[in-house]
Design a protein with these regions (language model features):
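Acidic/histidine-enriched, glycine/proline-rich intrinsically disordered or flexible terminal extensions
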Residues: 159, 163-190
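Hydrophobic alpha-helix feature that most strongly marks membrane-spanning transmembrane helices
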Residues: 38, 42-45, 59-63, 76, ...
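Generic signal for short, ordered secondary-structure residues
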Residues: 12, 34-37, 96, 112-113, ...
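Extended aliphatic helical segments
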Residues: 15, 29, 66-69, 118, ...
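Mixed-charge, polar/low-complexity N-terminal
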Residues: 29-30, 51-53, 114, 120-121, ...
Length: 190
């Protein structure tokens, strides 16, 4: 019920969602998406690191491996989500909007992406790191890994010590968060 309501509310007031790939990824579409990307980057965790040319190159060189889920209202693009198409998965990367609309983020980044992936025979959707709100929408917590090399031996030991504790806490958090998934728990199953 909640998901149906969210989806209805996201697409109210004449908002429509479109899944674009291949030749549908025009420069005008990339212009709009870049505006969304810049707006989100300027409001959240620091500065955006991709320039406008990057998106043109993405469209030129791998348009068939890109899915943009875009929303428009009254003929004007208002939000979008960038996904990369893998062999068996759809990978959500960036989101942005120039209109703040309830649940539109969930509609474009999760629900539309899941529908598109199912319709194209992909086994899963990887929605990216962070966000406890993903649990209610059926995304299992998964550990995200990274690798770093630290030149200074003293600093490396300090970071290694911290990361040992961090790994244990992340494992506990992942186990605890799994309990909140909206799936039925049956005896003998996860």
């Amino acid at each position: 019920k909640t998901i149906r309501r969210e989806r209805r509310d996201a697409l109210a007031d004449g908002v429509e969602a479109l899944c674009l790939t291949g030749s549908d990824l025009t420069e005008a579409v990339w212009d709009a998406f870049f505006d969304f990307y810049m707006d989100t980057g300027s409001r959240k965790w620091g500065r955006p690191y991709l320039n406008r040319r990057f998106f043109s190159l993405l469209g030129e060189r791998m348009a068939d491996r890109v899915l943009l889920v875009m929303a428009r209202r009254g003929g004007r693009w208002i939000a979008g989500a960038l996904n990369l198409i893998g062999a068996d998965a759809l990978y959500g990367r960036n989101w942005g909007a120039i209109e703040n609309r309830p649940f539109l983020h969930f509609e474009l980044c999760y629900y539309q992406a899941i529908e598109w992936a199912i319709g194209h025979g992909l086994a899963r959707v990887e929605a990216g790191a962070q966000g406890e709100h993903k649990l209610a929408r059926g995304y299992r917590p998964t550990t995200t890994y990274s690798a770093h090399w630290i030149a200074d031996p003293s600093f490396r030991r300090a970071v290694d010590d911290y990361l040992g504790r961090e790994r244990r806490q992340v494992a506990r958090d992942e186990a605890a968060l799994t309990e909140y998934l909206p799936f039925r728990h049956e005896e003998g199953s996860e």
